[in-house]
């Protein structure tokens, strides 16, 4: 069996990635989220596949087909609730995974980091088109508002929006193509995740100290497989608790009403995981400026490796940068809260302040703190 595991062309790849992989001996529970994201993706693809068997991508039938899944399909309610709340778990793990990457300096593996940012964009696109499918009020108006942002692009904006809609408004053709995108994109994510892993295994994992761990490595199995199973058990427990006891806690009540183009909901807002970006978008009064700020809020992740000024990789021994990191985290919580509030004072000014602070910490304060810490470490004699 050992020979087969180590010599068979296909098994060898699996063995080198998940069994005999040399891993640093000191990686903490923050390194669990990669495997949790993989499990989330598989869960979403499986539950999504069963939902797609019963879903009808037609404006007259979409809402009813989702109700039919919940009422008449065996365990349809559970599959639907697992899929909807699975998206929330996915983003929770994703944001913690990115946060860990920033805190411990994992972004210095540039190829892995860049593929990760592309993955983030793809997951966000998938979640957005998926949210439109139940064809409730918030689905319809969310699709209308977000696709309309492209009309801010000079010259080609309006044409581009109508091209995406497949008509002069969000309608049947929009829903059909969004369903097609939502079906294909998870497989693109799967392919990108494999490339992400490929680049990671070129260098090996980083560790909390940020020091080269080559002198002290242990096999991935059984040490980290057991550790990952613990994280997985906790995540599945939280997901099942959500799906079974309060499946609608993270959703929007407006989505229980079928889409009505003649009636606009009082507060159009996306799911909780997009609220921080939505707050940044709304904090700029100009439409094009808002769209650019929205893009910049995610694209700025690509600049983080270039803004690294410290001699140390991790924030473990850098108290000033640590403080800034936690201020940034608190700022993102504030932005998430503001994104769910109506556009009125004092929310407008809080959102604008939080948006400025977000960019300021990443572009100016963190690099300055790195330089200061580097200076403080220089011998003064």
Swiss-Prot record:
Keywords, in A-Z order:
Electron transport, Heme, Iron, Membrane, Metal-binding, Mitochondrion, Mitochondrion inner membrane, Respiratory chain, Transmembrane, Transmembrane helix, Transport, Ubiquinone
Q: What InterPro entries does the database record attribute to this sequence?
A: Cyt_b/b6_C, Cyt_b/b6_C_sf, Cyt_b/b6_N, Cytb/b6-like_sf, Cytochrome_b, Cytochrome_b_C_euk/bac, Cytochrome_b_N_euk/bac, Di-haem_cyt_TM
Organism's domain of life? Eukaryota
Residue positions annotated to bind a ubiquinone are 201
Give the co-factor note.
Binds 2 heme b groups non-covalently.
Show the GO cellular component annotation of the record.
mitochondrial inner membrane; respiratory chain complex III
Q: Some GO term, biological process aspect, for this entry: which one?
A: mitochondrial electron transport, ubiquinol to cytochrome c
Sites binding heme b b562 sit at 83, 182
A molecular function GO annotation: ubiquinol-cytochrome-c reductase activity
Positions binding heme b b566 in this chain are: 97, 196
Cofactor(s) the record lists: heme b
For membrane topology, the record states: Multi-pass membrane protein
- Main subcellular location of this protein, as a coarse class: mitochondrion
Q: Where in the cell is it found?
A: Mitochondrion inner membrane
Query: Which CDD domains does UniProt cross-reference here?
Result: cytochrome_b_C, Cytochrome_b_N
Name the residues that span the membrane.
33-53, 77-98, 113-133, 178-198, 226-246, 288-308, 320-340, 347-367
- According to its UniProt entry, what is the function of this protein? Component of the ubiquinol-cytochrome c reductase complex (complex III or cytochrome b-c1 complex) that is part of the mitochondrial respiratory chain. The b-c1 complex mediates electron transfer from ubiquinol to cytochrome c. Contributes to the generation of a proton gradient across the mitochondrial membrane that is then used for ATP synthesis.
Q: Further remark, if any?
A: Heme 1 (or BL or b562) is low-potential and absorbs at about 562 nm, and heme 2 (or BH or b566) is high-potential and absorbs at about 566 nm.
The UniProt similarity line reads: Belongs to the cytochrome b family.
Designated name of the protein: Cytochrome b
> What organism, scientifically named, is this protein from?
Rhyncholestes raphanurus (Chilean shrew opossum)
Question: Gene that codes for this?
Answer: MT-CYB
């Amino acid at each position: 069996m050992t020979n087969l595991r180590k010599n068979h062309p296909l098994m060898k790849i699996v063995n080198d990635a998940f069994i005999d992989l040399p891993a640093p001996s000191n990686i903490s529970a923050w390194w669990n989220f990669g495997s949790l994201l993989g499990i989330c993706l598989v869960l979403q693809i499986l539950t999504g596949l069963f939902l797609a068997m019963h879903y009808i991508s037609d404006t007259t039938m979409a809402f009813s087909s989702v109700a039919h899944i919940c009422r008449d399909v065996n365990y349809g309610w559970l599959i639907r609730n697992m899929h909807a709340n699975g998206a929330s778990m996915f983003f929770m793990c994703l944001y913690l995974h990115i946060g860990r990457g920033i805190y411990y300096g994992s972004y210095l593996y540039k190829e892995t980091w860049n593929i990760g940012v592309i993955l983030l964009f793809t997951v966000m696109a998938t979640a957005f088109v998926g949210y439109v499918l139940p064809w409730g009020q918030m689905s319809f108006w969310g699709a209308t508002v977000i696709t309309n942002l492209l009309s801010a692009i000079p010259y080609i904006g309006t044409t581009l929006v109508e091209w995406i809609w497949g008509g002069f408004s969000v309608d049947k053709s929009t829903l059909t193509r969004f369903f097609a995108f939502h079906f294909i994109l998870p497989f693109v994510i799967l392919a990108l995740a494999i490339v992400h892993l490929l680049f990671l295994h070129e260098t090996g994992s980083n560790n909390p100290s940020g020091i080269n761990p080559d002198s002290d490595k242990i096999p991935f199995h059984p040490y980290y497989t057991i550790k990952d199973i613990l994280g997985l058990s906790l995540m599945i427990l939280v997901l099942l608790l959500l799906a079974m006891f309060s499946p609608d806690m993270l959703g929007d009540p407006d989505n229980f009403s079928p889409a009505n183009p003649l009636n606009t909901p009082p507060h159009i807002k996306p799911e909780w995981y997009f609220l921080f970006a939505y707050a940044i978008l709304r904090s700029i009064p100009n439409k094009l400026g808002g769209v650019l700020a929205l893009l910049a809020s995610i694209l700025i992740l690509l600049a983080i490796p270039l803004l690294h000024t410290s001699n140390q990789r991790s924030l473990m021994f850098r108290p000033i940068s640590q403080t800034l990191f936690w201020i940034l985290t608190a700022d993102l919580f504030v932005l998430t809260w503001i994104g769910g509030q109506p556009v009125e004072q004092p929310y407008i000014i809080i959102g604008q302040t939080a948006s400025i602070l977000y960019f300021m910490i990443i572009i100016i304060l963190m690099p300055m703190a790195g330089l200061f810490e580097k200076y403080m470490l220089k011998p003064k004699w």
